[in-house]
Every structure is written in C-alpha cells, then in structure tokens.
Amino acid sequence: MNTSTNSSAFAPLKNDTFLRACLRQATDYTPIWMMRQAGRFLPEYRATRAKAGSFMGLATNTDYATEVTLQPVERFPIDAAILFSDILTVPDAMGLGLSFALGEGPKFAHPVQDEAAVAKLAVPDMDKLRYVFDAVTSIRKALNGKVPLIGFSGSPWTLGCYMVEGAGSDDYRLVKTMLYSRPDLMHRILQINADSVAQYLNAQIEAGAQAVMIFDSWGGVLADGAFQEFSLAYTARVLAQLKREHNGARIPRIVFTKGGGMWLKEMGLLDCDVLGLDWTVNLAKARAIVGDSKALQGNMDPNVLFASPAQIAAEATRVLDSFGTPYAGEGTGPTHIFNLGHGISQHTPPEHVAALVQAVHEHSRKMRA
C-alpha cells in the first residue's frame, strides 16, 4: 500500500522545538504537549463528538479526526499535535470486531483466547487502516507547519492484553493465564502484533507523521522477567523495523511504559530517541540511570491539574527543576519534553491546562537565561 506523501505537499515547520528536544538538541524553552490533549476535557471536542455520533465515528472520519486533533493546538500554545485515533485500530483491522459501548470501554466481539484463534491471526492489510493514514495527511496539511504531528500505536503487549481479555481488565487474569500456561501462544500473538505495529507506524510516517510514539500502557502490570520477555523484547522488535527518516527528515521514536520505572536501565538500551515516564519516577534519577543517550518526556501527575493555577505552576516548576539544567550547547545533550505522567482527565478545567502551558514555557525560559 502506498501511503507516501511528498514533503513538498506540506508547509515548512514554524515551531520545531519538540522535534529538536526529541533529538537532544538545545531549545530556547522546554516544549510541552499532553497525552490525550484532544479529548473530553475540551467543550469543542464534546461538540464534535456529538456530531460524529460515536467514538469510532469520530476516529474513522478524516474531517472529524482532523478537527479534534487541531482543537488543543488552536486553544493552547502547545508544541506538538498528536493524531486523534485509538490504539485498538490495529486489532480491529485483524478482524476482532471492535466496539465502544456508551459509558464503557472498548470491547472485542472475537477475543483471541485459544489456539485456533491464535492460528487465525495475521498482520492486517494496511488498506483497512487507510482512514488513519488519510487522517494523518489531512491533519499535517491543516496544521500548516504550526507544530509537528506525532503518530502513535499501542505496544505489542498492550494490544495483546486487550486482544486476549476482549476488553480492559482489572486483574489481567486471562492474558496472564495464557502467558504462564501457554507462552508459545502469547509469543505468537506478540510477534504478529510487533510486525503489525511496525507496518502501521511506518505507514503513518509515510502519510506525514513527524514523530511516532509507542504506548505500552499495560507493561507495568508484568512481573520482573516477564516484562523483559513479553513487553520490552517486542517493543524492541517494532523499533528495529521503524523508518529512521522520511523525505530527508529524522523521525524521532518515543516509548512510554506506564509503571515502567523499575526497568529504566533496560529501557535505556532501547533503540529509540525518547523515553516517556509516568509520575512515579524522579526525572533526575531517571536521567542518571538512562544516561544522556535518550531525551526524557514527562511526567507531572495529571491530577495536579485539579489544584489552583498557582499550585499547578509550582508543581510544573518542581518537575522542570527535577530534570535539571537543560542542554544549551552545540550538538546533542540531555533534553526534556514536558508532559503528564499519563493521559489528561476528562474532568480537567481547560483554563488549568492554559496555566500549565504558560508556567512550563515561562519557567523553562528562565532556566536557560
């Protein structure tokens, strides 16, 4: 499938702060974007979703996906946009029958719970995900060079959790039962997932994504040893297949494992440019463990955004200071991208997000003065 677009189809980038920080180059201030920044906390998102009629109606319609991706960029002076989509588009394209019931999470009509179901799994035809790649190109054009566009996917392990459980889970009983009793089946699922995710992200890059992120949302539920074997190894398998550059521009690769603080040393060896951290990790300690080969992204607790603007600014300052002095020289050095430690809550007051963005930009400029 050819999803490739020529870079001349897009306006030149006006704000490359995020991409420079990803590549460990000096910037005038610390860039900020937020996981789930296009979402229910914005009244304009809720209005567009009502028009679309459902979550998948939103995600599969190029115009709606473009509209909601741009909403936070138009409202706040953030430094990157992230594609509006869902991590479960890939298993849906495998024929698992994804649906979103109102007020409930995602569900699969055909979970992968036995040998026969695993035997039927294959890397999906990327044409089934054409709506995602069309959205990437549409968003990139609509951004008109304002900020870079991040593409993303779930990690092989996180997708596997949903595929085996058939939905979200509190205890991961079904997927862990398979992992321990039939590791051969679990590995087969993860191999197919890794190769699917690599093709999916490469197609997003060809369509116009300027960075890509792998969300390992459920890596942290694994035991030590199991994490390395069933999550980290397959994230590495994805990274090994990803395009390093497109149309002459480097494409940064970001990996975020929620609950991955235990394994920073191993994650520091991944072939990626940026490690995303949740709020349980101290940035200075992470920097010491990971070394200067990776930029760090994170990691304020999203619930700080329910405090007052003054308290939000104080906490943002603390997070920035905990990373330490950002790099200011030639070449490359330690850099930080400000983000939350997980997705923003749908109940967050938008004006509190505005206060956060302002505080991050102001304090991080002072740090470089």
UniProtKB/Swiss-Prot annotation:
A UniProt-annotated Pfam family: URO-D
InterPro entries documented for this protein: UROD/MetE-like_sf (IPR038071), Uroporphyrinogen_deCO2ase_HemE (IPR006361), Uroporphyrinogen_deCOase (IPR000257)
PROSITE patterns per record: UROD_1, UROD_2
Binding site for substrate: 36-40, 86, 162, 217, 342
Swiss-Prot/TrEMBL site (Transition state stabilizer) positions: 86
Biological function: Catalyzes the decarboxylation of four acetate groups of uroporphyrinogen-III to yield coproporphyrinogen-III.
Entry similarity comment: Belongs to the uroporphyrinogen decarboxylase family.
Record's subunit section: Homodimer.
Record's protein name: Uroporphyrinogen decarboxylase
Origin species: Albidiferax ferrireducens (strain ATCC BAA-621 / DSM 15236 / T118) (Rhodoferax ferrireducens)
